[in-house]
């Protein structure tokens, strides 16, 4: 998933190589502010996740690729804890520890293919827009199988190549769609990886993600560039895109619209074969 310096390699198609994203150097500074969600939105996610996770409580949860801890405390609160936020980038973990502390949360230095927890630890595991960062997704999924309890469930919240969301900013950065097609897996690819590691596919879910706040606030958050897609655009493309946004904002022509978010649910069967 990353080196000790927080360099995160994003998986890509051979025809569109993607550079590593340095979350210690670049992304951590504005990430928490740019990606912050109001409590009602966090609760909306928890309510949706609860419908697809094991019914018993408490649940031990792993937040894999937890970043600045945007969801980790909520996972502990909603499902009774403990919750483990596993994140390779030291600066992101430090931000989480400073701003997203919770008595039932532990933040751990770790990579997706080397999760620093014992076998059969978790009842539930969340990957929220982190899977595309894993350089060896097959190894990561095998490691996830190791740390899951029999009957445990995995929620993979990701963009999928065949369902790139139409974000309000998409048209201002014309190459962003192609970049995301290179960054993200397809649903059949994700399903094949998990089933090869012994998981059963439970379902694919799509939820509406509301537009947060007003458009001026959304523009200011976007300027923080806490979108990994932007790491693969040139400075000229970014400057031109933000100039187009400024013109549209002045003209009042930016459309505030919700987007659709996808996630897949997988279960580790009670008699899962050892795929390591």
Predicted region positions:
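A short SAM/SAH-binding and catalytic strip from SAM-dependent methyltransferases
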Residues: 123-136
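Class I SAM-dependent methyltransferase SAM/SAH-binding core
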Residues: 62-64, 68-114
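Conserved Class I S-adenosyl-L-methionine
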Residues: 38, 68, 202-276
């Amino acid at each position: 998933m990353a080196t000790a310096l927080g360099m995160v390699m994003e998986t890509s198609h051979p025809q569109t190589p993607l550079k590593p994203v340095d979350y210690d150097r670049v992304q951590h500074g504005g990430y928490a502010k740019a990606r912050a969600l109001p409590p009602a939105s966090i609760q909306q996610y928890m309510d949706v996740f609860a419908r697809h996770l094991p019914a018993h409580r408490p649940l031990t949860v792993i937040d894999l690729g937890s970043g600045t801890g945007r969801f980790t405390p909520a996972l502990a609160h909603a499902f009774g804890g403990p919750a483990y936020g596993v994140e390779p980038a030291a600066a992101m973990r430090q931000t989480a520890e400073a701003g997203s502390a919770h008595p039932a949360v532990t933040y751990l230095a770790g990579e997706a293919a080397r999760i620093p927890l014992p076998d059969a630890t978790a009842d539930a595991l969340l990957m929220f827009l982190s899977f595309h960062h894993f350089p060896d997704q097959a190894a990561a999924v095998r490691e996830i199988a190791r740390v899951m309890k029999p009957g445990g469930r995995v929620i993979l919240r990701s963009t999928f190549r065949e369902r790139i969301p139409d974000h309000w900013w998409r048209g201002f950065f014309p190459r962003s769609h192609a970049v995301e097609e290179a960054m993200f897996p397809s649903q059949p690819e994700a399903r094949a990886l998990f089933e090869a590691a012994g998981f059963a596919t439970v379902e694919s879910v799509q939820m509406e993600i509301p537009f947060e706040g007003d458009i001026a606030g959304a523009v200011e958050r976007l300027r923080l560039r806490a979108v990994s897609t932007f790491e693969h655009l040139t400075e000229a493309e970014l400057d031109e895109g933000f100039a187009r946004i400024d013109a549209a904002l002045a003209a009042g022509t930016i459309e505030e619209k919700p987007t659709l978010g996808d996630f897949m649910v997988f279960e580790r069967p009670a008699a899962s074969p050892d795929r390591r």
